[in-house]
Every structure is written in structure tokens, then in C-alpha cells.
């Protein structure tokens, strides 16, 4: 394996490990993630792996917002929007999640649609970039939400385990949104997509 390929591989493992340690509640899985983290550290200590400057494996990096992606997919008549039901609270979201380290924003959005909505899509345009905590006081990590509009491609397949179901909802009868989203922002993004606008904070 080329050295650069090894570094890319370790970055991906580190990304998965950090995500697992943050979100997993299974003690066996948590233990496995910690062991993986230790193995990555041991490999990074090898003399032939040199990481220059700030990188994913260092802790003292400049604090910066997290980035998530969301995608608006309308029905063919543009009277309904595709939403997914989150297992965590049995409420609804636009397909989406955290942006991936090794993908650009639109690729991350397509990946989330594939996993959560269970379909391929073609990204058609940028709808907006919003600050999730804009005008809200919080001690949490800031989050920027990048939203795209897309067209569904092909047939549906089974969504990932995080999703209970997917469904098109009429635009005048949207359900309650999951607590992982701000409902006012999700509605703003859907409206902007429908009207061909671009919104931002």
C-alpha cells in the first residue's frame, strides 16, 4: 500500500472511530472503537509516516463549526417532498447527516440520500447554507447546514438501520420534524427549493 493510501485509510478509520465513540451505546462496540483508535495511534508512530502541520489526528486545531448536509427531493408534480423517519425519535427529517471527510458536499448529500431515503439522486442545485444555531444561544458546537435540491433516480431500495421509513408528504401537510433539526429551518429550505431561491445566514 502506498504511503498516501495508508494515510487516507487511517483518516477514514479515525473518522469512523470518533463517530462510533460519540454515538454508540453498545459497550462491546465502544471497546472495539477504542482498540481501533489505539491501533491507529501505533501506526502513526511509525517513522515513515510524517504528518505536517495541523491534521485530523491532532487535538489543538482551530475551533470551527461542524458541517451537515440535507437534500430536498420533490415528487414529479412538485406537490410533495420526500422525508425520512428517524429511528432515534420516530420523527421526520430531510435526508441528510454529517458531511464526510473524504467527500465533497454534494457527494456527501448523495451518500446520505442513498443510505437514508434508499435511492440514488442527481443533485441539481444549492438551496442554501444556514447556521443551525443562528439566533439561538447554545454552548454546543456550532453547525452549518448545507442544503441541496435533487431529483430521485431509479427505484427505491431498503434504507439504512437509522431510518424507520420514507414517505412523500404534501407540502401543505408536513409532519413534525425530528429534534435533530430545527423545524423552522427545514421549512425555510423546502420553501426556498420550491420557489427556486437560495437562502443563507
Name every feature range the model reports, one short phrase each:
Residues 1-33, 91, 161-201:
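Nudix hydrolase/Nudix homology domain
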Residues 17, 37-40, 117:
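Long alpha-helical scaffolds
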Residues 53-93, 121, 125:
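N-terminal strand-loop-strand
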Residues 77-115:
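Conserved Nudix-box catalytic region and its N-terminal flanking loop in Nudix hydrolases
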Residues 99-123, 131-188, 200:
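Unchanged
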Amino acid at each position: 500500500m502506498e504511503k498516501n493510501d495508508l494515510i487516507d485509510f487511517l483518516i477514514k478509520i479515525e473518522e469512523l472511530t470518533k463517530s462510533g465513540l460519540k454515538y454508540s451505546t453498545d459497550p462491546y462496540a465502544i471497546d472495539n472503537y477504542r482498540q481501533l483508535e489505539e491501533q491507529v495511534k501505533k501506526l502513526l508512530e511509525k517513522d515513515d509516516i510524517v504528518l505536517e502541520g495541523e491534521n485530523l489526528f491532532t487535538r489543538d486545531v482551530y475551533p470551527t463549526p461542524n458541517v451537515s448536509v440535507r437534500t430536498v427531493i420533490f415528487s414529479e408534480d412538485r406537490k410533495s417532498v420526500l422525508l425520512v423517519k428517524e429511528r432515534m425519535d420516530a420523527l421526520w427529517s430531510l435526508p441528510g447527516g454529517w458531511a464526510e471527510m473524504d467527500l465533497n458536499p454534494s457527494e456527501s448529500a448523495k451518500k446520505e440520500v442513498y443510505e437514508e431515503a434508499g435511492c440514488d439522486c442527481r443533485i441539481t442545485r444549492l438551496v442554501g447554507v444556514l447556521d443551525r444555531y443562528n439566533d439561538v444561544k447554545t454552548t454546543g458546537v456550532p453547525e452549518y447546514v448545507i442544503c441541496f435540491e435533487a431529483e430521485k433516480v431509479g427505484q427505491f431500495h431498503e434504507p439504512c438501520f437509522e431510518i424507520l421509513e420514507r414517505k412523500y408528504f404534501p407540502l401543505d401537510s408536513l409532519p413534525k420534524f425530528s429534534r435533530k433539526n430545527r423545524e423552522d429551518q427545514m421549512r425555510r429550505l423546502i420553501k426556498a427549493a420550491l420557489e427556486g431561491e437560495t437562502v443563507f445566514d
